[in-house]
């Protein structure tokens, strides 16, 4: 396992990764656009990845860049001391697409309830499956 900065994955060459899993990481990253660009850069054409973030279903936009900097303030606002944003569904999809990805939203109806349950994924969760075409 490699421990690296997701916004600067220079240990990986361009187009060198077949598949990635990025689960509940991007909401912690100050520059999530750079992280998404790095994921796109290292992914091989035809490769794919699964991304998951907490999403506010009823929000009309991503909530970020607030003057909330202390861990205590983040706990009060985000419910976790190291989150830096709340995503909404369309905003998250748009950011992934801006990085170059084709984005597919796949849920329990695609994978099946048994698969979700076996992997500890909530039945209302959506997996953002991205592809580099």
For each predicted feature, which ranges?
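A short acidic, Gly/Pro-enriched loop at the edge of an enzyme's catalytic core
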Residues: 7-20
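Class I SAM-dependent methyltransferase SAM/SAH-binding core
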Residues: 1-9, 57
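S-adenosyl-L-methionine-dependent methyltransferase catalytic module, highlighting the catalytic core
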Residues: 30-40, 44, 48-133
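Alpha-helical architecture
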Residues: 3, 25-26, 86
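A short SAM/SAH-binding and catalytic strip from SAM-dependent methyltransferases
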Residues: 18-30
């Amino acid at each position: 396992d490699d421990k690296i900065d997701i916004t600067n994955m220079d240990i990986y060459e361009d187009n060198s990764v077949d598949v990635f899993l990025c689960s509940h990481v991007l909401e912690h990253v100050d520059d999530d656009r750079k992280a998404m660009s790095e994921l796109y850069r290292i992914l091989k054409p035809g490769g794919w990845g699964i991304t998951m973030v907490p999403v506010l279903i009823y929000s009309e936009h991503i909530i970020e860049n607030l003057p909330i900097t202390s861990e205590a303030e983040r706990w009060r606002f985000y419910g976790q001391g190291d989150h830096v944003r709340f995503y909404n569904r369309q905003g998250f999809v748009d950011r992934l697409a801006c990085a170059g990805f084709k984005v597919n939203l796949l849920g329990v109806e695609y994978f099946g309830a048994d698969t979700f349950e076996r992997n500890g994924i909530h039945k209302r969760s959506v997996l953002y499956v991205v592809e580099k075409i």
